[in-house]
């Protein structure tokens, strides 16, 4: 633990903590260090030179996980766009041209394609990727128009990463979408039709999980995917009640919804993973229109889900 009045501009941490890390790196024979914050290019370079090992900041780690999870062409485009924006923002500190990106820690994606990461080629590639994403966005718009004409309500599943959105989608629709406890196991949106116990037919869409301190360029890159929540009629906010940081995660979701300008939608909070609790958790989310204790694993509460014109909780 180190308490500083300000973050060191060159190495993020102070000289004393840097010396401690040097000893730890040698003792553990470490090949890499992960920093749970975003580092500037100067800080990345300073730490790598001082510690003589690979440094990954929070954003680079998230990008690496995204690259490993991307399956569809759209997901891969969005990941590459976010990676290149990250690289572009750091070129000034690392020089006008970086060496070719190879495989290994922190370099998945553009490195595997042997991209030259100088400014000119990055700008050209970003322009191309944005054009491709615009085509995807237009295609999504056509699909949304078709859904609108069908007059079937659309509900978007949102939540902090690993809250159990895909598991709920599977439990509700009988589908077999990949559901994993891994971070960001879902990068691509999936829509399934569902008839609720009250007979109401809806379309249910899974979305990418949110996370605390999600960088803005990641939100921008995945905007076409996140727009599914923006254009939905209802929001089903899935919460992992077994997580000790549940309240923080819920706030992150609401902050992200606000940034996406969808916080005014009708929201039903699904307090998931009740099967992991010693006693049922009945908590009213006063920011939502309704709250319901559920378990995707056991089916608890799923038959009670109702989204027709919910009334704001008092």
Per-region residue spans from a language model:
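Conserved P-loop NTPase architecture
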Residues: 1-154
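Residue-level signature of catalytic and energy-coupling elements of molecular machines
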Residues: 33, 84, 122, 168, ...
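Single conserved hydrophobic/aromatic residue that forms the stacking wall/gate
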Residues: 306-314
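Conserved GTPase G-domain signal focused on the G5
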Residues: 164, 276-280, 295-305
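Switch II of P-loop NTPase G domains
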Residues: 9-22, 208-230, 242-255
């Amino acid at each position: 633990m180190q308490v500083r009045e300000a973050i060191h501009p060159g190495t993020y941490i102070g000289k004393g903590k840097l010396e401690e890390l040097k000893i730890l790196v040698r003792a553990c024979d470490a090949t890499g260090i992960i920093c749970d914050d975003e580092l500037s290019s100067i800080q990345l370079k300073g730490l790598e030179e001082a510690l003589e090992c690979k440094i990954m900041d929070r954003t680079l780690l998230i990008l690496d996980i995204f690259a490993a999870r991307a399956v569809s062409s759209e997901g891969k485009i969005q990941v590459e766009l976010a990676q290149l924006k990250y690289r572009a923002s750091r070129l000034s500190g690392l020089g006008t041209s970086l060496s070719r990106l190879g495989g290994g820690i922190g370099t998945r994606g553009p490195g595997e394609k042997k991209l030259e990461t100088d400014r000119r080629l990055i700008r050209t590639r970003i322009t191309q990727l944005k054009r491709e994403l615009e085509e995807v966005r237009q295609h999504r718009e056509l699909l949304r128009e078709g859904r609108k004409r069908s007059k079937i309500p659309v509900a978007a599943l949102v939540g902090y990463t690993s809250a159990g959105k895909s598991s709920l989608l599977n439990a509700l629709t009988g589908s077999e979408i990949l559901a994993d406890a891994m971070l960001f196991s879902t990068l691509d949106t999936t829509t399934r039709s569902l008839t609720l116990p009250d007979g109401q037919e809806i379309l249910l869409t899974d979305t990418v999980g949110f996370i605390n301190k999600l960088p803005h360029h990641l939100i921008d890159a995945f905007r076409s995917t996140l727009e599914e929540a923006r254009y939905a009629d209802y929001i089903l906010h899935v919460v992992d009640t077994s997580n000790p940081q549940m309240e923080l995660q819920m706030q992150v979701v609401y902050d992200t919804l606000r940034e996406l300008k969808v916080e005014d939608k009708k929201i039903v909070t699904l307090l998931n993973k009740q099967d992991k609790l010693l006693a049922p958790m009945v908590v009213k989310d006063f920011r939502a229109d309704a709250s319901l204790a559920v378990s995707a694993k056991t089916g608890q509460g799923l038959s009670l889900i109702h989204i027709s014109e919910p009334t704001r909780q008092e």
